[in-house]
């Protein structure tokens, strides 16, 4: 399957284990399916595809703390145990890995799989890996969804300096998307939720302003009402047909998400972002989503991994 993609690895069924406490298929490990041939995705039976991006090359290039390449499998392991409250069809399609700093190759191959799945009517729920997943994911979507906006829940803008031809990293994905949009003469629709004042330099705030980025600071989420926050999102998505939703786990406070490269002492609580995430899903405009930056070696008692799985489970159960 995907034999022409050297960095693709098929799913590992051993990750999907859990408690069998009823005769019914009530947990994710009992719902998950696997395929042997990509042609099995060319059907009218539409599925939600789990796809991992096992890379922390972008984090290493960004001088961060590595370990996120182990994130996808750990998220799958934790998701497997959770109750599943819907009858959707789920497929674990495996991972795209990154070895020997071949980040651009891995991003290209990940994008090809995303494009193939969406072209055949499926939805992607992807697990990182570093936030370099965002540039890979966007590349797979952009040609299929012309009026596509990006909403990123993140402590950082990830708009670090980037010029075409340079090597990207976990801090440049949205600069890469902006450059791509400029080349294609497309509007750059980018919204960042949970921005930390001391997680971004003044020049990054200036760049966000120059690129007309919509954003809410972490302080905004503490101080403003939920109705005000939803009105802000409404304003951003009003003229968009589709949304690519990406979640960087470092948007959350370190007590909830210690297992990330850049933990945030003043980060958000899960229930500050969950209503906004659910609202976006309920808008019907989200076509693809991912969750990034889980680093199992940096985690404490699986807190971050379990939280990542719970966030995914909540969103998959939102209609």
From Swiss-Prot:
State where Mn(2+) 2 binds.
Answer: 154, 156, 248, 250
Q: Of which family is this protein a member? A: Belongs to the arginase family.
Identify the metabolic or biological route this protein is part of: Amino-acid degradation; L-histidine degradation into L-glutamate; L-glutamate from N-formimidoyl-L-glutamate (hydrolase route): step 1/1
Protein's job: Catalyzes the conversion of N-formimidoyl-L-glutamate to L-glutamate and formamide.
One of the protein's GO biological processes: L-histidine catabolic process to glutamate and formamide
Task: List the Pfam families hit by this protein, alphabetically.
Answer: Arginase
Q: Which SUPFAM superfamilies match?
A: Arginase/deacetylase (SSF52768)
Q: Which keywords describe this protein according to UniProt?
A: Histidine metabolism, Hydrolase, Manganese, Metal-binding
Cross-referenced Gene3D superfamilies: Ureohydrolase domain (3.40.800.10)
Name the domain of life this protein comes from.
Bacteria
Annotated catalysed reactions: N-formimidoyl-L-glutamate + H2O = formamide + L-glutamate
Chain sites annotated for binding Mn(2+) 1:
131, 154, 158, 248
Enzyme Commission identifier(s): 3.5.3.8
Q: What is the originating organism of this protein? A: Legionella pneumophila (strain Lens)
Q: How is the cofactor bound?
A: Binds 2 manganese ions per subunit.
- This chain's protein is named Formimidoylglutamase
Q: Which cofactors does the annotated protein need, by name?
A: Mn(2+)
Give the InterPro entries listed for this entry: HutG (IPR005923), Ureohydrolase (IPR006035), Ureohydrolase_dom_sf (IPR023696)
